[in-house]
Regions:
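Conserved functional hotspot residues or short segments at active or partner-binding sites
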Residues: 161-189
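Short acidic, Pro/Gly- and aromatic-enriched capping/linker segments at domain boundaries
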Residues: 146-155
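Cleft-lining beta-strand/loop regions that shape enzyme active-site pockets
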Residues: 1-145
């Protein structure tokens, strides 16, 4: 699945996002509608183990939380060309009443880090879990010969504050690690 939702008995709505595919933004919008209709103002956005996907999906999802024009990510070409700023479309439907926690771990990579980093740096939500993977490179396939190609890094992703995702990943505000015992017993700390 692309995502799962659950309204817990304690009133917290959990949205688990597994990837950033072409259909993810529409499914995310429907999940947010479900969240609003639940009457809760507490949302857990779980991107643990999410390897990423399309940048456009991450920008669209961030747009539900950010005013128009706010930077979601910066594509930095290392001085070879002007940086490209990817900005919120400004759906911004939540305002100040939203209580958002974003769950991350070493399996949160690429578009997961872009979404989590943007929401964190714009003070929309706090990061909880483990340090993320650090996959912040933009790659392009260059044809070589005989049907082979070479994948070349052409740029790197930066958070809205200009921090390199590739260098450090994202460090959570609150570190919570999942132990082997937690996994074996089906517990989610």
């Amino acid at each position: 699945p692309t995502l799962d939702t659950e309204l817990r008995p304690d009133g917290i709505f959990v949205l688990k996002l597994y990837n950033f595919s072409a259909i993810s933004p529409n499914l995310f919008r429907n999940a947010l509608r479900e969240f609003i209709l639940s009457g809760s103002n507490k949302l857990i956005l779980d991107v643990r183990g999410n390897p990423g996907g399309f940048l456009e999906a991450a920008v669209d999802m961030a747009s539900w939380f950010l005013p128009a024009g706010k930077v979601v990510a910066i594509e930095d070409y290392g001085g070879n060309q002007k940086p490209q700023y990817h900005r919120s479309k400004g759906y911004d439907i939540f305002g100040k009443n939203l209580k958002l926690v974003i769950l991350v771990n070493q399996g949160s990579a690429s578009a997961s880090e872009i979404l989590a980093g943007a929401l964190h740096e714009h003070n929309i939500g706090m990061l909880v879990g483990e340090k993320t993977f650090g996959k912040g490179s933009v790659q392009e396939l260059i044809p070589v010969t005989g049907g082979t190609s070479l994948k070349v890094t052409i740029a790197r992703w930066l958070t809205p504050n200009g921090n390199s995702i590739s260098l450090d990943g994202l460090t959570p505000d609150t570190v919570v690690s999942m132990t082997l015992e937690d996994v074996e017993k089906g517990r989610d700390p």
